[in-house]
């Protein structure tokens, strides 16, 4: 813990006077109990992973308080200090305000593919895999996250610091590109409830023709999962996110956004 705090202090001293420095995030994805126990069986080296566990909220709050105290003493007042929600967005309430923290932001990572994961592990898997059910399911899942973001944002500005359009519907859809566009519009409209949103921008695996965005969709070497929607360059090249199309224009995406009122 002390080592991590020292690294944060060194980073703050190095970059505090950079005019382009918007913020520093204290820690990336401190895992919750539910997330850890849902993925703990995927360790590549079981012996090395032995003893690992989730990050308790009490410990995380203590670390965040110490990190804030050290960083705020170094950074300029206008520089934002960002804290990840630890996959517990609604557990924070007004804690940051009560802790006396100024100019802070809460980062939450919202992946549709992760939201739907538990549903496909249960007995209703075949039902959910039928494409006609997935748009309804996505409206429900993303809508619930939008409500959670709005609730948390009453106490602290919320940043959707990671998201992407990966989902199980598009690869099974007759029109893959249109499915991705609908999922994009649905999420962008929901994440507008936050102070900002950042698409995952790193390429996880190259396609069959590196740099072209064409060829066979890249696959996760661990489980064969689809990675094509994680690469922002590929997504943008294929038009799966469209800058010239308002993401609240429901007329072009009736199957997912049909229940939204225009301009919401």
What is each stretch, according to the model?
Residues 107, 170-264:
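Aromatic-rich peripheral "rim/lid" segments of glycoside hydrolase catalytic domains that contact
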Residues 1-169, 187-210:
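Active-site region of glycoside hydrolase catalytic domains
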């Amino acid at each position: 813990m002390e080592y991590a705090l020292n690294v944060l202090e060194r980073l703050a001293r190095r970059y505090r006077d950079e005019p382009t420095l918007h913020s520093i995030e204290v820690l990336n994805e401190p895992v919750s109990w539910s997330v850890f126990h849902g993925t703990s069986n995927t360790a590549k080296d079981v012996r090395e992973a032995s003893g690992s566990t989730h990050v308790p909220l009490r410990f995380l709050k203590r670390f965040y308080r110490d990190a804030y105290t050290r960083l705020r003493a170094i950074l300029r007042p206008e520089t934002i200090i960002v804290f990840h929600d630890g996959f517990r967005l609604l557990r924070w309430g007004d804690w940051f305000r009560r802790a006396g923290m100024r100019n802070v932001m809460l980062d939450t990572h919202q992946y549709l593919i992760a939201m739907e994961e538990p549903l496909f592990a249960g007995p209703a898997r075949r039902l959910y895999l039928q494409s006609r059910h997935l748009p309804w399911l996505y409206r429900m899942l993303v809508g619930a996250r939008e409500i959670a973001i709005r609730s948390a944002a009453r106490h602290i500005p919320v940043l959707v610091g990671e998201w992407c359009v990966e989902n199980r519907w598009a690869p099974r859809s007759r029109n893959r590109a249109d499915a991705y566009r609908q999922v994009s519009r649905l999420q962008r409209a929901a994440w507008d409830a936050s102070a900002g949103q950042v698409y995952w921008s790193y390429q996880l695996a190259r396609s069959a023709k590196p740099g072209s965005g064409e060829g066979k969709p890249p696959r996760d070497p661990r489980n064969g999962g689809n990675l094509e929607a994680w690469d922002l360059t590929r997504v943008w090249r294929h038009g799966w996110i469209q800058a010239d199309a308002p993401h609240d224009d429901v007329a072009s995406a009736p199957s997912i956004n049909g229940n939204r009122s225009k301009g919401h």
